Curated annotation (Swiss-Prot):
Lineage: Bacteria, Bacillati, Actinomycetota, Actinomycetes, Frankiales
Organism listed in the record: Frankia casuarinae (strain DSM 45818 / CECT 9043 / HFP020203 / CcI3)
InterPro entries xrefs: Fmt (IPR005794), Formyl_trans_C (IPR005793), Formyl_transf_N (IPR002376), Formyl_transf_N_sf (IPR036477), Formyl_transferase-like_C_sf (IPR011034), Met-tRNA-FMT_C (IPR044135), Met-tRNA-FMT_N (IPR041711)
Name this protein carries in UniProt: Methionyl-tRNA formyltransferase
UniProt keyword Protein biosynthesis present: yes
CDD domains membership: FMT_core_Met-tRNA-FMT_N, Met_tRNA_FMT_C
């Protein structure tokens, strides 16, 4: 089939590569979001999908808005049979949806109808789900509501970050997307309507949501830190400055379903008050939560790069009884990292 692929970030690359490599399909163009400033220097760079398309010699369309008449005319002129989509990042208008004869077919990283929306993987980790997956479905005007061509399942590992899980789903999902394209071309697959039960939504994880409340149970702190890694990054405050927190380690009593890490000796008999930070004799950095303490792994102080929590603690010389993140002590917009 003649395909016009739509996608923007790195998570879309496995699918684009798989479709380019498929002998059964011809990717005649790629649609991606316009170049944007990125990184610490805020230099304008093309998104990863644009870069791969250039390397493969595939024409790239980067409309500011997919409803622009010029873009719609160009798309119609390409006469695509189908438009596969992975993390494009913009809503497609009905005029665009009507152009390919087999419509637009999206790879979504959840088991629909669960977690419709922009952040299904992060919401999966926040909820503590053990099982997730990916769905390939027909795009309709309503968000992520179209009939489903196929699904795959993936176990959530106890230490998964959103980046880890998304990488696995992107690789596995690429094969599923190609299989669906093959089935559409052969006329052997038909989409099945999503059930009316089990619908949930996955809005983008905001910076405010990513702020750690140390009064919550250790398992909730663990889930938030993993869900927010690599973005937007879980965070707290220390001495009125923002401190990003990477994945933490839980003690055996903290509630992780598998793979507990016993906390080392040196903690007070009653544990630590919520938010209180303590450097243990072996150098580990413990923080109290609403249940049992967690051990910090990697942290990122405001204006600096990531570092081991032990190295950070040595540098700041934590005083006895110091705490992290008094709720309400700092506006969410304050500071940079």
């Amino acid at each position: 089939m003649r395909l016009v692929f739509a996608g923007t970030p790195a998570v879309a690359l496995p699918s684009l590569r798989a479709l380019i490599d498929s002998p059964r399909h011809d990717v005649v163009a790629v649609v991606t979001r316009p170049d944007r400033p990125s990184g610490r220097g805020r230099k304008v760079k093309p998104p990863p999908v644009h870069v791969l398309a250039d390397e493969a010699g595939i024409p790239v369309l980067s409309p500011d808005r997919p409803r622009d008449p010029e873009f719609l005319a160009t798309l119609a002129g390409l006469a695509p049979d189908c438009c596969p989509v992975v993390a494009y990042g913009a809503l497609l208008p009905p005029a665009a949806l009507a152009i390919p004869r087999h419509g637009w077919v999206n790879l979504h990283f959840s088991l629909l109808p669960a977690y419709r929306g922009a952040a299904p993987v992060q919401r999966t980790l926040l909820a503590g789900d053990d099982l997730t997956g990916a769905s390939v479905f027909q795009i309709e005007p309503a968000m992520d509501s179209g009939p489903v061509y196929g699904v795959l399942t993936e176990r959530v590992r106890p230490t998964d970050t959103s980046g880890d899980l998304l990488d696995r789903l992107a690789e596995a999902g690429a094969g599923l997307l190609v299989a669906v394209m093959d089935g559409i071309a052969d006329g052997t697959v038909r989409p099945v309507a999503q059930p009316a039960e089990g619908i949930s939504f996955a809005p983008k994880l905001t910076a405010e949501e990513a702020r750690i409340d140390w009064t919550k149970p250790a398992i909730a702190v663990d889930r938030l830190a993993r869900a927010a890694t690599p973005a937007p990054g879980a965070w707290t405050t220390f001495r009125d400055r923002r401190l990003k927190i990477g994945p933490v380690r839980l003690g055996a009593v903290s509630g992780r379903p598998a793979g507990p890490v016993a906390l080392p000796a040196g903690l007070p008999a009653g544990g630590l008050p919520a938010g209180q930070i303590m450097v243990l004799p072996g150098g580990d950095v413990a923080v109290g939560t609403g249940t049992s303490p967690v051990l910090l792994g990697e942290v990122r102080p405001e204006g600096r790069g990531p570092m081991a929590a032990a190295a950070w603690a040595r540098g700041v010389r934590i005083a006895k009884g110091e705490t992290l993140g008094a709720i309400g002590a700092m506006p969410v917009s304050g500071g940079t990292s």
